Curated annotation (Swiss-Prot):
Record's subcellular location: Periplasm
Ranges where the Cytochrome c domain occurs: 12-90, 99-191
Record protein name field: Cytochrome c4
GO cellular component: periplasmic space
Pfam families given in the database record: Cytochrom_C
Species whose genome carries this gene: Thiocapsa roseopersicina
Record PTM text: Binds 2 heme c groups covalently per subunit.
UniProt-recorded Gene Ontology molecular function terms: electron transfer activity; heme binding; iron ion binding
Lineage: Bacteria, Pseudomonadati, Pseudomonadota, Gammaproteobacteria, Chromatiales
C-alpha cells in the first residue's frame, strides 16, 4: 500500500437522530418527520444523502429564514444522525385532487414536449418513491402539494438555486402555474 487509508464512510446514528429530531425538528417537521403543516416538507422516508445535502446547504450557502438558524448549530455528526433517523421513518400517505392529479401524472411521467418540460420520472423514479440517492435527487411521493408547489415556484423564480447544474431551475422555468399545481397534487397522492 502507499500508506494512505481510505476515509471510513460517515454513518449516522438513527437513535441519536431521533433524540435531536424530537428536540429541534418536531415542531415543524412533525412526529417521525411527517409534517402536519402542508408548507413544511415531510422528511420521513427521504434518502439520507438528500437530507444531508439540504442541511449542509442550509449551513453553508442556502439562506432560509426558518432553516438556516436551525441548521447552523448542527455538527456534521448531528446532520448524519438526523438523516439516518428520518430515512428509517414511515411516511404518511397523502390524498390528491383526482382531476389535477390525472393531469399531473401525465406531466410527471412524460413531461411536456411542446414546452420542453422534461419528465420528472427521469430523475425521481417512475412513481416518485425512488429518486436517486447517490445523485441526491429526493423521493417525492406523498409530499405535501403545498410544499412541492412552493418549491417548484422557488426554482422557477430562481429563489432556490441549490440544484446541481441548474437542473430544477431549467425544468421549472418551463412549467405553467397549472402544471405546477397538477404535478404537486399528483405527487401528494402517490403512496410509494
Amino acid at each position: 500500500t502507499d500508506g494512505h487509508q481510505a476515509a471510513a464512510p460517515q454513518v449516522g446514528d438513527p437513535q441519536a437522530g431521533e433524540a435531536k429530531a424530537n428536540g429541534v425538528c418536531l415542531a415543524c417537521h412533525g412526529p417521525q418527520g411527517n409534517s402536519l403543516v402542508p408548507i413544511w416538507p415531510k422528511l420521513a422516508g427521504q434518502h439520507p444523502e438528500y437530507i444531508v445535502k439540504q442541511l449542509m446547504d442550509f449551513k453553508q450557502r442556502r439562506a432560509n429564514e426558518q432553516m438556516t438558524p436551525m441548521a447552523m448549530p448542527l455538527t456534521d455528526q448531528e446532520v448524519l444522525d438526523l438523516a439516518a433517523y428520518y430515512a428509517t421513518q414511515p411516511k404518511t400517505p397523502g390524498a390528491a385532487d383526482p382531476e389535477l392529479a390525472s393531469k399531473g401524472e401525465s406531466l410527471y411521467r412524460w413531461g411536456n414536449p411542446e414546452t420542453g418540460v422534461p419528465a420528472c420520472s427521469g430523475c425521481h423514479g417512475p412513481a416518485g418513491g425512488a429518486g436517486q440517492s447517490l445523485a441526491k435527487f429526493p423521493r417525492l411521493s406523498a409530499q405535501h402539494a403545498d410544499y412541492t408547489k412552493q418549491t417548484l415556484e422557488h426554482f422557477r423564480g430562481a429563489l432556490r438555486a441549490n440544484d446541481p447544474n441548474g437542473m430544477m431551475r431549467g425544468a421549472a422555468a418551463r412549467l405553467s402555474d397549472q402544471e405546477i399545481a397538477a404535478v404537486s397534487q399528483y405527487l401528494q397522492g402517490l403512496s410509494q
